[in-house]
Amino acid sequence: LCSSFSILFLFWSITRLGIKAIVRKGEEFTTAKQWAVIGAGAVGGLAYTFSDSFWFSAVEGEVYAMSSFFTAFVFWAILKWEEEDTTNPIGAMRWLVVIAYLMGLSIGVHLLNLLVIPTICFVYYFKKHKFEWKSFIITGIISLILLGGIQNIMIPKIVKFAADYEVFFVNKLGMGFNVGSIVYFVLLFTAITSLILHTINKKESYYKFGFYTAVLFAAIATISGYGASALITRAIVLGALLYGIHKLKTKSENTLNVILISFATLIIGYSSFFILIIRSQANTPMDENDPENAITMLSYLNREQYGDWPLTYGQYYNAPTKSQQYFKDGEPVYAKNEKTQKYEITDDRKKSIPVYEEEYCTVFPRMWSQQANHEASYRYWGDVQGHHKKKVKMNEQSGQMEEVQIPTFMANLNYFVGYQLKYMYLRYFAWNFIGRQNDIQGLNGNPLEGNWKTGIKGVDDFFLDTDTAFVQHAAKNNMANNSFFALPFILGILGFFFQYKNNKGDMWVVSLLFLLTGLAIVFYLNQYPYQPRERDYAYAASFYAFAVWIGLGVLFLFDLLSKKSNAKTAAILATVVGLIIPTIMAAQGWDDHNRSKRTMSRDFAVNYLNSCAPNAILFTNGDNDTFPLWYAQEVEGIRTDVRVVNLSLLQTDWYINQMRRAAYESAPVPFTIPAEKYVQGTRDVVYIMDKGTGPMNLKKAIEFVESDDPTNKLDYGSRPLDYFPTNTFYVPVDSMQVMREKVVAVKDTARLAKNIKWTINRSYLTKNDLMVLDLIAHNNWKRPIYFAVTTGAEAYLGLEEYFQLEGLSYRLVPIKNTETEMQQGGRVNTDVMYDNIMNKFMWGGLDKKGVSLDENCTRMASNMRMQMATLAGALINKGQKQKAEKVLDLCLEKMPDENVRYEATLYTIIAGYYQIGNMKKATDLSAKLFDIYENDLKVYQSQKSIHRASFNREIGQAKEIMRRLVMLAEQFKQDAHSKELMTRLTAIVPMEELMPQEPQGPTQQPEQVLQ
C-alpha cells in the first residue's frame, strides 16, 4: 500500500512540475498539453514502479517502502503549498504544518526522509525570491543547518534531555523513577502550548507564562547535562533559541505561529516512538533494546549497537592508536537499580574513545575500517600501491622494524570515487535505468558479478571489459539479467534538459532531491568494502527524483513532435513512445521480482525449528538466521516451545534479561550469572590466560569469572580485567540424567563420555560466549541445546567434537565424535535427521518451475543440499543404502539445477551415488558437474589479466572439483568416464598443476574437499 501511494504522489508531482514546465506565462493549457502532462505522469510513475530497487522494496518486509511513501508525500505536499500560496498564502501555510507532521512521523520509519528538507527550502526560495547566486547559496546553507538541527539536535536531544531530566531528578533530587520524565514533558508541553495560544489570542499573559516556562525548561536541561562542555553548549544553543523566540514575537508573530505549530506537530509525529515504550513496558517476547524509559530509549534511538564512523576527519585503516592516556571519554552508561532506587553508572566509558596518530589521519576519511579483511580491498580500490607515503616503525607483536604504507589523500579519493561513488551508487543507478547483469553480489568489481549492462553487446563488452556472451554457470539464465537498453536513462536525460530549458527553478529543486538522496547518502554512509548485501535500497529516493525526469522526458518528445505534427497527435505519440519504456522494464523485471512461488524464508525457518527436540534452546547468529524464525513463532505460532537465542544480541544485557523470562511455551533460559554481573560495561570481554593449571570444571570457571575478588582479575591499571585462568574446560556428565532426558538413543549409551572436555583456542571471549558457557555449565542436560548450522565455527567455542547433526542444527551431546566422524562432517543422528528431512521439512517452492531465487535463497538451498549429502553419507556408512538413495533422490527432486544451480556441494551427492552403486546416475551427474566447472574455468581463464586475479579462488575450486571427479570415477572403476574427464581436464589444465593426492572419502564435506 505504501508503495502504491508513493506512485500516486509521484504521478501528481510529475504532472504539477510538467504543467509548470509546459505552460509558459500567458499560454493556454490546451487539451493536447493536458494529455501530454498526464502521459508524462503515467510514464514517470510506471518507470519508477518497475525500477529494480523500488520494486524490490515494495515486496520486501522492510521500512523502505514506507520511507518512499513519506518522501513522495512530503515532496508532493510542498508542491501543493507552492500551488496554493499564490492565491491563498495564509491558507497554504497548513501544508507546511502537514509537512512538519509527516516529517515527525517519518522519523519513526527512517531518517532518510529528512533529506527532503533542503528541497522544501528551495521550493520556498524559488516561490518567494528571484534567483541570485548569493541568496541561492544562503538558502542552501540555511537548509543544511535546518537539516542538521533536526537530525543531530532535535531528534536525539528531545530524548536525551528527557533522560538527563530523569537522572537529575532521581539521583540529584532523590525523587522516584519517571518523575523527571514527567516534569520534562509537562514543561515542554506547557511552554509550546502557551506560546502558540499567545500567537493566536495575542494575550501577553500567555506569552510570559510560556516564555518563562521555556526558560525553566532550558535551565534544568542545561544543569542536568553531563560535563562542562555539555553545560556550555546547551546554555548557548538554548539561550539562542529563547532569544530567537523573543525577537520573532516582536517582529513577526505570524512567522512565530507557523514555526511553533510546525514544531509542535513535528513532535506529535515524533511521539509515535511512545508506542515502543508502551510496548516495552509489557515485556513482549520481542523487545529490542528494552526501551522502557528515557534512558534505554536514548540507546535505542542512537543505534548504539551499530557503532559509528568518521565523516569529516578520521583515521586510515592501518592507523595505530595513541597510548590510552590520550583516549577521550565517552558518556557514561546508566542503568536502573531497583534496590538503591537510583540510576547507577555501569560503564563510565572513561578513556573509551580511541585517538589515532595524526600522521595516519585525514580530512574526508573514506578508508577508515580497521577490520583485517578490509585492507586488501582498500588497497585495491584506492590504488594504495601507487599512492602512499612510506614509514618505518616497530611491529608491536614481533618487535621487528617494518615498513608501512600510509595512504595519501589521492588514494582516499580513489576509493571514494571508484568504490563508494561508482560501485556503490552509480552501479545501482544503472541497474534501475540502464540494465542489470545478474543478482550475484558484486564484492570486488570483477566483470562477471552484479554489474550493470545495457543489453547491447558491443557497449557492454566495452564497459565491462569482457566478452559478455561467455558467462559462468551461476549466471546463466539468471532472472535478474535485465536489459533496458539504457532507454529509461536516455528519456530521463531528455527530461532533465527539458526542465532546465523551461523551468530552471524546478530543475534545481529536483536536482537537489536527486543529489541529496544520492551523493549525500554516499558521503554519510561512508561504506566499507565487502558489505553483507547490496545496498541499492538506500538510494531509492534518488531514483525517485530521476523518475520525475523520465516523466518530463515525455514532454520533451511532445515538444519535439508538436513542431512537426498536430498537437494532439504529438501528445498521443509521445505518451505511446514513452510507455514503451516502463513496458520493457516490467517485462524484463517481472521474473526476478515475482515471489509468488517462493516461501523459502518461512519454510526454512520452520525447518530450523523442527530440527530441534521439544523445549530446546537454539542458538542463531545474524538477521537472516533469526528473523524468519521469529516470524514463524510470533505470527504462525509454530514451535513456540523452542527458545531462539540470537548470539549477536546476546552480547547485550537487555537481551539476556529477556531470555531469562518465559515466552509462550518456552521456559526461561537457565542462565545463572546475576544481572549485575553482566550489565553493560561489565564482563563485555573475558580474556583467556592459560596459567598451565590444566582442565577446569566449567562451573568453577564461571564462578571464577563472575567473582569480584581482585585476585581473580588481571591487573591492568585502573581497570582490572576479567579472565579465565585456562583455555581447557570440562563438564561432568551425569549419565542417569542424560538417560532420563533421552539426550541420546539407547543404542548410543555405551559411547557416553564421563566428561565433556574441550579447548577454546581464542585469546578472549565476549559476553555472548560467556553466557553460552554459563548455560552449558548449569543446564545438566535438562534442555536440549542446539546451534544452527549457519552460525559459524567462531560461535561453536571449540565444542564441535560433541556436536550431533539432526537437521539444520547441531545438538550438543555427551558423545565425542570419532576422528572418522569428524572427517566426514561430524556425527549424525541418522534416525532423527532422516525423519526430519523426509517427513517434516518443507521446501519453500525450490522445486517449482520458474521460481525466482535470489543469491541469498540459493545460498540457503545449497546449504540444505550439503546437509542432505551429509545425512546420505552417514546412512551409507551404516549400510543403509536404500535410505541414503531416497535422501539423494529427494535432494535432486527438490533442488533441480534449473532452480538451484549445481555447484561444489553436488560433488558429495555424486560420491553418494557412486557408493550406493548407482553408477549411471553418478556418472551422469559427474558429467554435468564437470561440464559446469569446465565452462567456468574457461570463462575465468578468458578474462583479462587485470581481472583474472579476482577469480583465483574460483579457478582453484574448478580445478580441484574436476580433478576429484576424475579420481572418483577411477576409484569406482568407471574407466571410460574417468579417461574422458581426464582428457578434457589436461586439455585446459597443465599436468603439473594436477597435484597427485590420495582420494578423499566420498562423504567428505565440500568445504573440506576444497580447502
Spans of features found by a protein language model:
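Short helix- or helix-capping micro-motifs
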Residues: 41-49, 103
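Phosphate- and divalent-cation-binding pockets in alpha/beta enzyme and binding domains
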Residues: 627-631
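Short hydrophobic/aromatic helix or loop-helix immediately within or flanking a transmembrane segment
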Residues: 1, 5-8, 464-466
